[in-house]
């Protein structure tokens, strides 16, 4: 059952789903992302990761409009340490290669500096394959 987060206009900006078959959480970010929305969404994602004792996150930014640089510092300094402490080990981030969101994702990856296994993908199937390979190696 997905969790939908909506903005002040009633539009869904994030759909979070736990995928029990693959044992990962899937975040589908949609549209322009505000700082408050990113913080709320990232925290909601942490809850689902914790509830399912999940170490794998598939984060999809292909439908994001514009950059989200305004939240990168918070993600690196606040969210990531809590996610790692909660057991998150692998973060697959799917972006449209030429988008401003891709630039923000690269900034996030640099900020994390190896604290978390994070890779950027332009193809969601490649991201899923990477997470599945990580799961096989972990068992």
PLM regions with names:
Residues 1-139:
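Amphipathic, Lys/Arg-enriched alpha-helical "gate/interface" segment within cytosolic domains
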């Amino acid at each position: 059952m997905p969790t939908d987060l909506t903005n002040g206009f009633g539009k869904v900006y994030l759909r979070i789903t736990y995928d029990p078959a693959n044992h990962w959480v899937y975040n589908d970010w949609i549209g322009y992302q505000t700082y408050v929305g990113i913080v709320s969404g990232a925290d909601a994602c942490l809850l689902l990761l914790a509830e399912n004792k999940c170490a794998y996150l598939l984060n999809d930014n292909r439908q994001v409009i514009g950059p989200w640089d305004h939240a990168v510092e918070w993600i690196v300094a606040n969210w990531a340490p809590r996610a790692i402490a909660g057991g998150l080990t692998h973060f697959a981030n799917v972006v449209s290669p030429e988008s401003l969101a891709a630039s923000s994702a690269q900034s996030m990856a640099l900020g994390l500096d190896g604290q978390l296994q994070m890779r950027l993908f332009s193809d969601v199937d490649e991201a899923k394959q990477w997470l599945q390979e990580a799961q096989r190696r972990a068992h």
